[in-house]
């Protein structure tokens, strides 16, 4: 299948894991060449080769272990013994990675290979900062912001289109910034829209409006 070496459509897939009071937001980005990137809560990142990417996807989709082993045999043309050995080793580490109750050190606690920094070239950023406005309710003399830039702001429909495009690019994390983003009346609606798409959202703010209980 064209651009589907694993038989799975490339893109970003979102999952949630909950154990008691603990939660993990998980994003798996599958690239066109079969490689994958796993992000946990938008702050932990793991690069996967095609076999690891396929196993990660099938585990997250809660596919039966025997079916996963058969899929590995079929896709990578390996014998059952090899597929079983690789799967057991990977699943042991992967279950720890995605567990909300565990926080393993990738270097000390897991049987994972490390990569030289910047040796991988991502197909898209892992985070996008969106400046909703350059207006601000502070007037700090040391601020780099220029008041004359506070014009030609996008409306809510335009920002939703931006968010849709960012998600389609495979970017799982957006941070709303400015200026002061809480000056945008429709900020809560943008956050809701981004979360419905599957994104993790963040906010760069001076916090003044957040001190108002009616705003929260």
Regions found by a protein language model. Name each.
Residues 57-67:
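Short capping segments at the starts of secondary-structure elements
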Residues 71-80:
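Short helix-coil junctions and helix-kink-helix linkers
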Residues 75, 85, 89, 93, ...:
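Conserved alpha-helical substructure of the radical SAM core
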């Amino acid at each position: 299948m064209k651009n589907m070496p694993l038989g799975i459509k490339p893109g970003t897939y979102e999952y949630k894991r909950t154990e008691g009071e603990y939660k993990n937001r998980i994003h798996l980005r599958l690239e066109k060449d079969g490689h994958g990137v796993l992000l946990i809560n938008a702050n932990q990142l793991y690069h996967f080769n095609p076999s690891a990417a396929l196993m990660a996807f099938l585990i997250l989709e809660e596919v039966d272990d025997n079916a996963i082993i058969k899929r590995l045999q079929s896709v990578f043309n390996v014998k059952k013994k090899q597929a079983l050995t690789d799967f057991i080793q990977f699943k042991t580490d992967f279950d720890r990675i995605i567990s909300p109750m565990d926080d393993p050190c990738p270097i000390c606690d897991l049987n994972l290979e490390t990569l030289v920094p910047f040796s991988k070239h991502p197909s898209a950023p892992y985070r996008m900062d969106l400046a909703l406005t350059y207006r601000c309710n502070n007037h700090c003399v040391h601020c780099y912001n220029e008041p004359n830039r506070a014009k030609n702001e996008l409306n809510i429909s335009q920002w939703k289109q931006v968010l849709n495009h960012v998600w389609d690019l495979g970017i799982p994390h957006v941070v709303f910034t400015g200026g002061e983003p809480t000056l945008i009346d429709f900020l809560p609606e943008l956050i809701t829209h981004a979360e419905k798409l599957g994104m993790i959202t963040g906010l760069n703010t001076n916090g003044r409006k957040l001190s108002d209980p009616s705003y929260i």
